[in-house]
Regions:
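Bacterial N-terminal signal peptides
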Residues: 2-10
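The feature marks long extracellular or luminal low-complexity segments
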Residues: 11-281
Length: 281
């Protein structure tokens, strides 16, 4: 009976001595040390987002977990077992930013538009862990080497959002997101906005009338892109003839087959041009 009592007391003492100490701050991709108390052999288990390992350890010594086992950020559990088990949870945080995923929409925008460009940036460490710790992302919009807009945005739930206007000149707009020494760049093509001050001229031909526009610009002076459609309309009393013509090298031209005194006009989108009156020959 005395022997059984000694064994029971020893088991209680071992139960009281067994303890697991985990790091208060761990970083992805770095080795960690887990402390234990007591003496003798035990079995160690580590359970994490993508890891599950088991090996024998000696109580009272530090258990070193190699960096390869902590590359994925998240919640981990360390378990040490003898005749019973003790466990402790700890969190592995992402490492420093190593890359930015940067999405910008759309890829083509008219000039002079408010809040027409949208961007979203997400930071990842070298192991692909999304970084949730709040940080400041710097956005810059530049065209022809000059900065148009600079904005600093605090991440929320790992995401930094951008809404920005387009510039006034057609051409490539570079949109850059930066976080510390990491950056990503995207290019948005700025094109002319709607035509402005549409004007036409014309002359009689044996088959009707030949009309063309003056060089077409938007209100900021940018040439409208080739392919922009201009609709020419010729009226002679109740008779109406229409021709759609694409802009080529800033000008749209059309041959309209119509007779008599004509009133010719042009329109592109919501923009109306001047009216041209051509007398019958």
């Amino acid at each position: 009976m005395l022997g059984l009592g000694v064994v029971a007391l020893a088991a209680v003492a071992l139960s009281q001595d067994l303890n697991v100490r985990v790091p208060s701050a761990a970083v992805a991709g770095e080795s960690i040390s887990i402390g234990t108390t007591g003496s003798g052999s035990a079995t160690f288990y580590l359970i994490g987002p993508t890891v599950s390992l088991k090996h024998d350890v000696q109580l009272g010594s530090e258990i070193v977990v190699p960096s390869k086992q902590t590359e994925i950020a998240g919640q981990y559990k360390a378990v040490v077992c003898v005749d019973h088990c003790q466990s402790a949870d700890f969190y592995v945080a992402p490492a420093k930013p190593a890359s930015l995923t940067f999405l910008v929409h759309p890829s083509r925008v008219p000039v002079g538009q408010n809040d027409v460009i949208s961007g979203v940036a997400l930071a990842f460490d070298e192991f692909g862990n999304l970084i949730f710790e709040p940080s400041t992302v710097d956005f810059q919009l530049a065209a022809k080497g000059s900065a148009l807009t600079t904005r600093s945005v605090q991440t929320q739930n790992a995401i930094a959002w951008l809404r920005a206007p387009s510039g006034k000149a057609a051409g490539a707009l570079q949109v850059t997101a930066s976080l510390h020494d990491v950056s990503a760049r995207r290019v948005v093509q700025q094109v002319a906005s709607d035509p402005c001050n549409l004007r036409i001229k014309g002359q009689r031909t044996p088959k009707g009338v030949l009309v063309e526009t003056e060089p077409i610009r938007d209100c900021a002076g940018n040439p409208v892109p080739d392919g922009t459609v201009v609709t020419f309309t010729a009226k002679n009393g109740n008779e109406i003839s229409t021709v759609d013509a694409p802009v080529k090298q800033d000008v749209a031209r059309a041959q309209i087959q119509a007779k008599g005194t004509l009133v010719v006009s042009a329109a592109s989108g919501v923009v109306m041009g001047n009216e041209l009156r051509l007398e019958a020959q």
